[in-house]
Amino acid sequence: MKITRKAATQRRHRRIRRKVFGTPERPRLAVFRSHRHIYAQVIDDVAQHTLVSASTLDRELREAFKDIGTATREAAAVVGRSVAQRALQAGICQVVFDRGGKLYHGRVQALAEAAREAGLQF
């Protein structure tokens, strides 16, 4: 039986989530990538609470996506900078990166690098 790409992603995500856990001191930066959008959340897994979030659907960021679109590396970088700025404003300096079963490449990589450049440590 052939393993589909979706099944492989889900297996990878389960394997990653067994090891990656967000605490109040070092929450988890979870990234979800769809075909058209990208979402990033900083999550405290102990309290099961989302502390900050950003996505290509945010009203504050919509102007930035008029020319570049929402499914590009540039859009992912904008989201990464935004989530990092919001996390730093909330007093969160260090996070654990959860790539959500996706490969560390393309939009996921662009988001992570932009968040690091904006001052988030992981």
Curated annotation (Swiss-Prot):
Record keywords: Ribonucleoprotein, Ribosomal protein, RNA-binding, rRNA-binding
GO biological process: translation
One Pfam family matching this protein: Ribosomal_L18p
Domain of life: Bacteria
SUPFAM superfamilies documented for this protein: Translational machinery components
Gene3D superfamilies linked: 3.30.420.100
One GO CC term, this protein: cytosolic large ribosomal subunit
Any one GO molecular-function label of the UniProt entry: 5S rRNA binding
Function text: This is one of the proteins that bind and probably mediate the attachment of the 5S RNA into the large ribosomal subunit, where it forms part of the central protuberance.
Subunit structure: Part of the 50S ribosomal subunit; part of the 5S rRNA/L5/L18/L25 subcomplex. Contacts the 5S and 23S rRNAs.
Family: Belongs to the universal ribosomal protein uL18 family.
UniProt name for this protein: Large ribosomal subunit protein uL18
UniProt lineage: Bacteria, Bacillati, Cyanobacteriota, Cyanophyceae, Synechococcales
